[in-house]
Amino acid sequence: MNTNPFYFIIEEEVWKNNIMKQIKIFLLFLLLVVLGFSLYKINQINNELNSSQEIKEELIELVEIPETPSDEPSFQVDFEELKKINSDVIGWIVIEGTGINYPIVQGNNNSFYLNHSYDKKWNSLGSIFADYQSSNDFSDYNTFIYGHHTRNGSMFGELYKYMDVSFYKQNKTFYLYTPTGNFTAEIFSAYIDSTDSSSYNQSFNSITEFNDYINLVKEKSNYSTDVKIDVNKDKIITLYSCSHESNRKKNDRYFIHAVLRKLS
């Protein structure tokens, strides 16, 4: 047995060095795994962005855009062909001043189109879709339309612009096209609220309840508008998306309310 005290010190140092070497190797391995996964996710997101853009370009070929602009855009949407691609298509939304120019789909739940594109293939960007409980002809008092708030501005990534009154003044209306008729949508309220907000309501038992709701969301708006609403006959739609603005809570959402006006 070696009784030299330096022997034990040296042996302990060797042991410590081996442990440190193993820790460094493990940390390097962990770093490479994280880096590899990050690169994989970045590549996946880029592929999904490209796929989503390609699908959008293919679908836009089914929309006839007039060569000369007018106060009432006369887009012609070939819903017959769109429904051959996906029978869940119920409309098309166009918001000028943004890149929002998409078909609207409706599934049998509110989960599927959160991460599936218009061709029903997996895509984390999802689709623009109507609440599954709503009538597919937008005849309910209030139809909710959902879409992701994306960093690259696709889907509902540009709804945030309506938080600014100056943008609203330049883009007070947007357009909704359906198989049975086309509409302008006059925005009368825009704000950020939480997922458990009383604004998240699309079912009313009476005209009085609907009128109370209209007054409620008008009060919440970032700015006032002069839009008139006849609760006895008018229907509204609500654009709904996540809010990623600074100092906002993760449960905050954009609410954009608009009243539908039938185009002649």
Regions found by a protein language model. Give the residues of each.
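Solvent-exposed, non-transmembrane regions of membrane-associated and secreted proteins
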Residues: 35-264
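Gram-positive cell-envelope targeting signals
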Residues: 1-63
